[in-house]
Amino acid sequence: MYLYSFDRFFGVDKVCLLGDTGKKKIKPGDLLVFGNQYFLAIGETLVFSEQYQHLETVKPELVYKEFMTKSTLDLFHWMVETYYTTYKSVVRLFITNAIEKLLEREGKLKAQGSKLKAVVQSWGFSLSVEWQTLIVFPDLWTMFNSTSEDFRESEGVAFLSATQTEKQKDVHRWEIKKWLKSVIICTYAEIFQDFHDLKKIIFVDPHKRYYASQQDPRYKVGEVLEKMRELYWAELEIIWLYY
């Protein structure tokens, strides 16, 4: 089993091997700890495995079952292969290295009431009533001109922005993973979440291209959303806005 280390100074591309754990069965997606270092089990195989011939072996303890879903792990591997990049570059798009703080914030979540009723009534487009919907905007200007403040602040909606604090982002990660939020609205940089069960993706104005200085990986948003549609068996809808 290959592991990904959240320690910023760990080894080649922060990848290592899982040592003997006795009778404890470790599965891909599990979170483990060794000393003060956290590791994510990412699977029995790696993309570009020839680059990982001499890896360190560690024997960590299990700390969180199913910390990441299979669909998210599959997206990790696909992005590494498709964009010829590293696991380090891909994983950081999804999750912070401050795992202890992330785990602490899970226990502070507040239970939500009815998630969808008010949201569906206030939104003109078709949402997934039973599962999660991701709505992706090219920029905040388009988002704010296409949605009302009441909608963005609805109980069942997670509004994600690159301007939010790390604490806010961590809380949203848990809310999305645990299905406390049914509708996720965001710009391109925030699409990388560990969804509970994503069944609808709405891609708004895809003709607006995304650029980022020194961006790695240099992913194409449309390609990533299409792969997410495939992995989650979700519907992908493209919306064109005319002002």
Question: Each predicted region: which residue ranges?
Answer:
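Accessory, non-ATPase domains that flank or precede helicase/AAA+ motor cores in DNA-metabolism machines
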Residues: 1-242
